[in-house]
A protein has these predicted regions:
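Short, glycine-/Ser/Thr-/acidic-enriched flexible segments
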Residues: 6-8, 12, 69-72, 82-84, ...
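Glycine-rich phosphate-binding loops that contact phosphosugars or nucleotide phosphates
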Residues: 195-344, 425-467, 490, 498
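Structural motif
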Residues: 31, 62-65, 74-76, 83-85, ...
Length: 515
């Protein structure tokens, strides 16, 4: 038995099975499923019947696969609320089963995704899929992911490889959303009119939620469109009222994030039009959306998201520009200027990557010895501060927090001393003077400041910092995309200095498919 997920009623089922005299060797919910299947088999059920009966009793979000003693030619898989896919070999009759197309990529590109409550029987005759007691047909899709895309290349870790792929994947994503000849944004046909959207709801988890927070600044500034950003795990249970004619954007790298999928379903039940920003077009979130805005990041193997985040930001900015043009807020000239700023980003990201030796020194000398690190930013740099703190804590296990710089005086400034590094994300935008004031307040209290800014920002503040990075000057609107790169590399080199598992941090999973 292979099982991913949670059986919510496992204790109830275990009590029933123990009352029948069955002995358990563990306290896991996985063994409860195995014992339940065995009980049905001993009552005369076939393996197929046993799985059907078990599915009728199990509650929770899970995917599972069972191999039966004496039936080496038989696999039975089932899913509810967690991804499971069947892979078809290239004409040789070989069958595979795994979580998604990425897991199956080394073996096949031909994939069928199971729907909720589906269970599949795989034997010498192929795959038969059932839902309840009815056999059903599911489409075989051709995945664009190949096994060759999943190596580390010449890099030490997948995360570092994926950080260095960002100029290319942001460029690939831009090719789908920005016409370089006309400097205009092109989105897929949308099933709604931006002028009739009363409110935009963005829902996501983790890093994807920070992408949504940046997008809030963009949609409200460029399109004058009210936006609420919701943590999916809270949104799905709070069940807030949603406006008539509203649009919900669901953001997920995998397209299988369980809380985001549940939030999407709630929004859909409230008659919201669903737009998804996903990296896997065949995923559950994509399949349940009215329109999909795919990122073109390619497979992301490292648990800590990097290139998926920057491509999500790229897509969301293109969408905000499209909304701004449609709503008459963004002029053609201003839109063309921003499109040009976007098209210049791959080269500017590459320039930021060329500073890697500086990131490594700062990480080794300033961040790695620390027990606590603060990140500060204002405006659209605030979510990048949050993302920087998340990256650091995810892979280096150093406690880190991100704050809006203006909130320092409301509590966090009490933490400042000579042992707490403070990383300040400070492009020279309209809020730079305010950020500089917060920077100087930290300095006055003995804080160890690390400055991320352009040449103008460094000219004013670098002398007060223990370390400073000079980034290319960019349009303030696109700055969050560029300034993501240094916080990623600071986290990466800190984790390497501390000797942690960069690609597989403890207690974390790449795709959170269970609550």
């Amino acid at each position: 038995m292979v099982h991913n997920g949670i059986i919510e009623n496992f204790q109830e089922l275990k009590n029933e099975l123990q009352a029948e005299g069955r002995r358990f060797d563990s306290d896991t919910d996985t063994e409860v499923v195995a014992q339940l299947l065995t009980a049905h088999l001993e009552r005369g059920a076939t393996p197929e019947q046993a799985m059907g009966k078990a599915m009728a009793r199990l509650r929770g979000a899970f995917a599972l696969v069972a191999l039966f003693s004496g039936r080496d030619d038989l696999l039975i898989g089932a899913r509810r609320g967690s991804s499971l896919a069947v892979g078809y070999g290239d004409g040789d009759g070989t069958m595979y089963i795994g979580t998604d197309a990425l897991a199956l990529a080394p073996f096949t590109k031909r994939v069928t995704y199971l729907e909720d409550d589906d269970w599949v029987v795989i034997d010498h005759a192929g795959a038969r899929i059932f839902n309840g007691d009815q056999e059903v047909k599911r489409e075989i899709r051709l995945s664009g992911i190949s096994g060759a895309m999943m190596g580390k290349g010449n890099h030490r870790h997948f995360m570092l490889k994926e950080i260095y792929e960002q100029p290319a994947v942001v460029g690939d994503t831009l090719q789908s959303y920005v016409d370089p000849a006309t400097r205009t944004v092109r989105l897929p046909a949308l099933p709604f009119d931006w002028n009739k959207v009363s409110r935009l709801t963005i829902t996501a988890c983790g890093t994807a939620c920070f992408a949504g927070m940046v997008a809030k600044y963009w949609f409200e500034k460029l399109a004058r469109l009210p936006v609420e950003v919701e943590v999916a795990s809270e949104f799905r249970y709070r069940e807030p009222p949603l406006p008539e004619g509203g649009v919900c954007i669901a953001i997920s790298q995998s397209g299988e994030t369980v809380d985001t999928l549940a939030a999407l379903r709630y929004a859909k039940a409230q008659d919201q039009t669903i737009v998804s920003v996903v990296n896997v077009p065949e995923s559950a979130i994509a399949r349940e959306s009215d329109v999909v805005l795919p990122t073109l990041a390619g497979p992301e193997i490292g648990v800590a998201s990097t290139k998926a985040f920057t491509t999500q930001l790229t897509v969301l900015l293109a969408a905000a520009m499209d909304a701004g043009r449609a709503r008459g807020v963004l002029s053609a000239a201003e839109s063309a200027r921003l499109a040009n700023a976007l098209l210049e980003l791959p080269g500017q990201i590459n320039a930021a990557l060329n500073l890697e030796a500086q990131y490594r020194l700062i990480s080794e000398d300033v961040l790695a010895p620390a027990r606590d690190v603060l990140y500060l930013g204002r405006g659209s740099s605030f979510p990048i501060a949050l993302e920087g703190a998340l990256k650091l804590k995810e892979i280096s296990y150093i406690h880190a927090e991100g704050y809006a710089a203006g909130e320092m005086k409301h509590g966090p400034i009490a933490l400042i001393d000579e042992f707490v590094p403070v990383v300040v994300v400070a492009p020279t935008d309209a809020l730079f003077d305010k950020t500089a004031s917060n920077f100087e307040q930290v300095k006055a209290r003995g804080g160890k400041l690390v400055l991320l800014s352009d040449s103008a920002g460094n000219a004013r503040l670098a002398s007060q910092a223990v370390a400073a990075i000079v980034l290319p000057k960019v349009d303030p609107v696109v700055a969050p995309i560029l300034y993501t790169v240094p916080v990623q590399l600071l986290a990466y080199h800190t984790a390497v200095a501390k000797g942690t598992d960069v690609d597989q941090p403890r207690n974390l999973a790449k795709s959170v498919t269970v609550e």
